[in-house]
């Protein structure tokens, strides 16, 4: 990379702290803003006394179809790490369905051809909501409609209940009209049924190998038809809620739909299986279970010989899966790649829940290192418990590891993700999220003191909002309440901007407050700017104010 000729005051070393899920809202704690409700002496000083901007982290600013779409950690880190905006999975799949390209592709033809040739079942497995973070129910409906047009003999659905990217007890709001639609299809002669399911944080959708038992539980109900039997998904959900009135959708147990004591939709030899999630992190492990010959994460039993496809390819380096319906975004020339090619030392750190975000997603959906000699990646293992039970998560160990790395001063660019605001926020537990934020406050302060000592510039930002809006709000911005008058928890991300602050030990660097509509895509150039390097062609401009 070329050194910039514009500046003379750059420290050339930067620490980027990503406070996952910590957006900005002017609303107070009475509206569910856990950030406003927390005692944050250091972070409030940062946001009020150091140069700070609010930048866009949702919608079109991160490659989503519209500005009504929430940002998320995957697209956020893609944009942070690439300095540009790429159309993301949600938009790519929707566009491919609208154009018909998805159904003219070789993979779809193979999926349909396999079921017709073998007179076998087409299984659609994926997250069942319109959250548009991992999946969209409209995509599933489009696949069903096309499969019926092409006269697939039998269709079975394996639904993962959301309650995380959508309201926490909304499963029946999606299920009831969907079942009505399925009933109309059955009356027209289609053999189609829901076969299995469960909450997304109970089965199937593990990521970063945090808890393979989730995938095993999913395998048992989807593939083997082993589990608690119900006559319908509605009966399963209502039963689980009656047994545990406090349970929310993402934690609902697994279930199997049965007829006359037999599962209606086991996955068997000759079947076709499509995983309908477009986002990769929580799709990789179940895809490995279906496709990996030398698989040792759990006992699959006899592996059914199926034709497996993803609605997208989830890992381009691993070519996982080999068969996919829509090509993923082609993200090139990332910041990490540029730095590695120029031998600029980098350090990336997080706990398991966000480790892939500061590595794989930051690097443009690429696994591994660009140059292991100049890059150091560190993962701290996450606990396998509900995160509101331990809202500090692994923030202390992360802070200690990063302090050590900063004091060793071997790298020029450091990046870290603190998962607390997002992962605790997703539980819907307001008080636990307040505790998480208060714990993070001390961690960030410790790192700033180390940066001051080492003359390292500190950038503090987020990838999207979550902790900033923990209660459901109506269209007028008022808190929605349940029948007991209690605020209804919100577990999804928000549409709010995120703060970005710059802490310069020499107190020289300022933001350009006149930049039009800045977003996450401006952060990569900002990092290079502070380090004294020219911005690559095509990157969104730096947020730094030019020297006069």
Curated annotation (Swiss-Prot):
GO terms for molecular function: manganese ion binding; phosphoglycerate mutase activity. It catalyses: (2R)-2-phosphoglycerate = (2R)-3-phosphoglycerate. The keyword Isomerase applies. The keyword ATP-binding does not apply. Binds 2 manganese ions per subunit. GO terms for biological process: carbohydrate metabolic process; glucose catabolic process; glycolytic process. Substrate binds at residues 134, 164-165, 200, 207, 279-282, 354. It holds the Pfam family Metalloenzyme. One of its GO terms (cellular component) is cytoplasm. Mn(2+) 1 binds at residues 422, 426, 493. Its EC number is 5.4.2.12. Keywords: Glycolysis, Isomerase, Manganese, Metal-binding. Its cofactor is Mn(2+). Mn(2+) 2 binds at residues 20, 73, 463-464. Pathway: Carbohydrate degradation; glycolysis; pyruvate from D-glyceraldehyde 3-phosphate: step 3/5. The active site is at residue 73. InterPro entries: Alkaline_phosphatase_core_sf, BPG-indep_PGM_N, Metalloenzyme, PGAM_B_sf, Pgm_bpd_ind. Belongs to the BPG-independent phosphoglycerate mutase family. PANTHER family: 2,3-BISPHOSPHOGLYCERATE-INDEPENDENT PHOSPHOGLYCERATE MUTASE. Monomer. Catalyzes the interconversion of 2-phosphoglycerate and 3-phosphoglycerate. This is Probable 2,3-bisphosphoglycerate-independent phosphoglycerate mutase. It comes from Leptospira interrogans serogroup Icterohaemorrhagiae serovar Lai (strain 56601). The lineage of its organism: Bacteria, Pseudomonadati, Spirochaetota, Spirochaetia, Leptospirales.
